[in-house]
Amino acid sequence: MVRIRKRGELFLEKEDKLKVIEKIEKIIDPTLKEFGLELVDVEYLQDGGYWYVRIYIEYLDKEISLGDCAKVSSAVGDDIDKIIDKKFFLEISSPGIERPLKKPEDFIRFQGSKIKVSLKHKLNDKKNFEGVLTKFENNIVFLQTEDEMQIPFKEIRKSNLVYDFKDI
């Protein structure tokens, strides 16, 4: 679901973007909870000269529909307009089959799944790993690659599920 929001254009530093994302998360969370939805991720970025707010949502027990996305867009759009003082596109969608893993709860929920992990700092001369998430305990991600790795949650820059398209 894409919705064009109208405001003036400005350039933002990374820290300012993070503050905007935090404000968006805080302001939309009650509405999402009211609809029985979980917030997966919020992106605030510029692409091709246009600004975008992308909100990824899901139900824990069923799939998201286009109608769900439209309902959320209508419910939160005006609140987000109060935070962002520029023209932007508001996009609401499911996170997709290769959804990001952002919170400790995500790592618990998707134990047994194949994931990709990018680290903030090198571990064994590498920053990127792919393997099976065997468990999450005490803020440590246990990842089965050739060996079992233990990765502190705070060292993860980015992580997402990996869908094996060979299973289609």
Regions found by a protein language model. Give the residues of each.
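Short Lys/Arg-rich amphipathic alpha-helical segments
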Residues: 1-168
